[in-house]
Amino acid sequence: MQIRGTARKYVYILTPYLIIDNTMQQALCLAAQAGVDVRIVTPKIRDKWYVHPATQFTYEELLRSGVRIFEYTPGFIHSKVFLSDDMVATVGTVNMDYRSFYFHFECGVFMQGTSAIKDVKDDIESILADSEEIVLSKWEKRPWYKKLWETLLHVFAPFM
């Protein structure tokens, strides 16, 4: 949360599971509305049938707030990376989901003021180039049954 709270130019997030609570969602939306370039990359190819629709449940509100969402298309991406303003980054095991935030003991490397941050940014830019951007106007037109499925699975989000 601190990285997103202090970002002035951008924050990039790579996560295989984007199952966030209202506080996290609001922080991302507020950052985007304040002019921060917020980009999130999730996998298009899923590893768990129930997690992907639960992840997609949050897309619409994030997109409406100006958050840019990308789905990595070449394969399943399992990276957990946060990068902000060419100044700070974390790389580790922390997913953006309830289990990582509240139940698991996760670890990560926090980087500040190191040349490794440029390498992290270069990697993220390469991943973004191989990803499909989700566009709000197209996203809103997805079938009703997909919206229903996302909503139903979101009910179980705290257990995922």
Annotated model-derived regions:
Residues 7-12, 17-160:
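PLD/PLD-like phosphodiesterase catalytic module centered on the HKD motif
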